[in-house]
Amino acid sequence: MPRAYPRGVLEISLRLTCLLNALAAGTTTAAHAEEHLNRWAVAHHVNDPDELLALPDHDPIASLPILQALARLEHGGIDHTRAPEDAAADIVRTNPAAPTVWELVLPTPGNYAGLRGPTRIVSEALDAGTAVICHQGAWAGTMWIGTRVGHGVHWRILRANPPLPPMSPLEALQELRAQMRHTADLLEGLGLSAGERPDTVAPRLGSGYSSGDQAVLETAWTVWHACQAGLDSAHEVLTAHGVRT
């Protein structure tokens, strides 16, 4: 069953993913990335409890402005000596010289979206429902989890094992279409008619992404908003189903 996400967190996490990839490609700067994120939430702060960013004089309990975290990501790689023992083997197998690639993951119970541990980190990602993780390159295994706090966002940077490689755009589109057919069959089984197409516009991924990537996002965005509308009216749907049965 589709899950409801905290309002805005999914969109902001998607935007952070695009900006982190742009930083890695050298097509944007930390200052520009911060400015862009501030259009989505008035303030962003970061907690780095494992000190993965290795910032000088950093208190692992305190939070810091996101600009400092973005600048660190822009100019250096992770300190692998700080990685926990259960992640060490994965880090050794990961090529730090490979292009840094970040992805947005939406783990659910029974489908961890490629996450491979540690268990505690996967559990936190499951609770949040969305996370941004680097699956190759100098920051492989670094994960961002965001939480809405008032009009801002609080981010935690955590050490996970590098995840499984993501699907290609074609594979993602095929999987998405299969899920759409499955959902349509379920709705038909409940005797429910189709509603109106959600009036939504998907975010632009940016110049670093292909037209195929954008097409998959636009389809997924429409489906996601349709699912959100269904979840918002879940009580009415269940009541209607009860009357029919």
Language-model regions, residue ranges each:
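Short, isolated positions within intrinsically disordered regulatory regions of eukaryotic proteins
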Residues: 44, 106, 143, 148, ...
